[in-house]
Curated annotation (Swiss-Prot):
Its cofactor is [4Fe-4S] cluster. This is 5-amino-6-(D-ribitylamino)uracil--L-tyrosine 4-hydroxyphenyl transferase. It comes from Methanococcus vannielii (strain ATCC 35089 / DSM 1224 / JCM 13029 / OCM 148 / SB). Coiled coil: none annotated. The gene is cofH. Catalyzes the radical-mediated synthesis of 5-amino-5-(4-hydroxybenzyl)-6-(D-ribitylimino)-5,6-dihydrouracil from 5-amino-6-(D-ribitylamino)uracil and L-tyrosine. Binds 1 [4Fe-4S] cluster. The cluster is coordinated with 3 cysteines and an exchangeable S-adenosyl-L-methionine. Consists of two subunits, CofG and CofH. It catalyses: 5-amino-6-(D-ribitylamino)uracil + L-tyrosine + S-adenosyl-L-methionine = 5-amino-5-(4-hydroxybenzyl)-6-(D-ribitylimino)-5,6-dihydrouracil + 2-iminoacetate + 5'-deoxyadenosine + L-methionine + H(+). NCBIfam families: CofH family radical SAM protein, F420_cofH, PRK07360.1. It is an enzyme of class 2 (transferase). One of its GO terms (molecular function) is 4 iron, 4 sulfur cluster binding. Its EC number is 2.5.1.147. InterPro entries: Aldolase_TIM, CofH/MnqC-like_C, CofH_family, Elp3/MiaA/NifB-like_rSAM, F420, FO_synthase_su2, rSAM.
């Protein structure tokens, strides 16, 4: 395998799989990815001042990797109405956040109009403070809410966009293979449905992120299949702003408790995912985000030297990783984020949701 040639060529799915299977050239793969990263985006590492608002942890979903959901009767359950969500968004804006990420569980009472009310109230309450970028609702949430009020996805997305939705998180992707999905999230939208929601969003002016959750029951071939689907969508729509690998946090997940998964990904796989995704995507998808919440600061810093060029955000409130067993905190100050970047000789730059730099 001629790794040097991979710096320039648009590698095939077969070559991508060979990289995942390669056990002899680990550090060489990381170096190739780092060279591509430097050529593509330089030594700038971006971050965003943001807040996560999870408006409910009650969910009818059956995802076997999720430790966040509860039943309505659970004393730890919560459900924030649109006014409460707006209050949290205002607090985030006053604290300096330029982005708020809003997500919640799946319930019959959560329809597109409920989502639109959240957006409208967040937009209105933050307007006199310069507004805030609203990054909200996964493809699964959009589809479920649309079905709850008899709309199709395109109709729902128009209502959400008109109500203030700027971008969407490309979560609920997990692994884009229906055999795997039937095992880990049997009632979630299918691969083709996820693709449809995302493409429809892109074609109607709503950009999204894209994600991949790895380190559970998938095989290397499924990782390649997933990355290939994302790459083909990006070639068609140019609608992804970033790729976010999400390492599976196993400790509190049902998959772990029922014995399907003994542990999550190794540190080697974590770094290979960042490196190989950089080599595979090249300039089709320039921004690859490392997750300090899931990886911790030190491994995230290493990932900045093998493909990643963004460290995500300050978060301010992040409940899902914490519930799953994440042990690296759920909030980081801007100063700490910048130091995390500076300490690996990179240049920190603040950005907004669309990766436009902020002075």
């Amino acid at each position: 395998m001629d790794l040097i040639s991979f710096k320039e060529k648009d590698i095939s799915k077969k070559e991508c799989l060979e990289l995942f299977l390669d056990t002899e050239n680990f550090f060489d793969i990381l170096k190739v990815a780092d060279d591509i990263r430097k050529e593509s985006v330089g030594d700038t590492v971006t971050y965003v001042l943001n807040a996560n608002i999870n408006f409910t942890n009650v969910c009818s979903g059956t995802c076997k990797f999720c430790a966040f959901k509860t039943e309505k009767e659970d004393p730890n359950s919560f459900f924030l109405n649109p006014d409460k969500v707006a209050e949290k968004a205002l607090l985030a804006r006053k604290t300096g956040a330029t982005e708020v990420c809003i997500q919640g569980g799946l319930l019959p009472e959560i329809d597109t109009y409920f989502q639109a009310e959240i957006l409208q109230k967040v937009k209105k309450i933050t307007e006199k403070y310069g507004g805030i970028d609203i990054h909200a609702f996964s493809p699964m949430e959009v589809k479920s809410a649309a079905e709850n009020c008899g709309l199709n996805v395109k109709e729902a997305l128009k209502i959400l966009k008109d109500s203030g939705l700027k971008t969407m998180p490309g979560t609920a992707a997990e692994i884009l293979n229906d055999e795997i999905r039937n095992e880990i999230c049997p009632t979630k939208l299918t691969t083709s449905e996820w693709i449809d929601v995302v493409k429809t969003a892109h074609k109607n002016g709503i950009k999204t992120t894209c994600t991949m959750m790895y380190g559970h029951i998938e095989e290397n071939v499924h990782l390649v299949e997933h990355l290939s689907i994302l790459k083909e969508i990006q070639k068609e729509t140019s609608g992804f702003t970033e790729f976010v690998p999400l390492t599976f946090l196993h400790e509190n997940a049902p998959l772990h408790h029922i014995g399907k998964v003994k542990s999550g990904a190794s540190g080697i796989l974590d770094l290979k995912v960042y490196a190989i995704s950089r080599i595979f995507f090249k300039n089709y998808l320039k921004n690859i985000q490392t997750s300090w919440v899931k990886l911790g600061i030190k491994l995230s810093q290493i990932s900045l030297n093998c493909g990643a060029n963004d460290v995500g955000g300050t978060l301010m409130e992040e409940s899902i990783s914490k519930a799953a067993g994440g042990s690296f905190g759920t909030c980081m100050s801007e100063e700490k984020l910048k130091n995390m970047i500076l300490n690996v000789n990179k240049i920190p730059k603040k950005r907004n949701t669309l990766y436009e730099l902020i002075n």
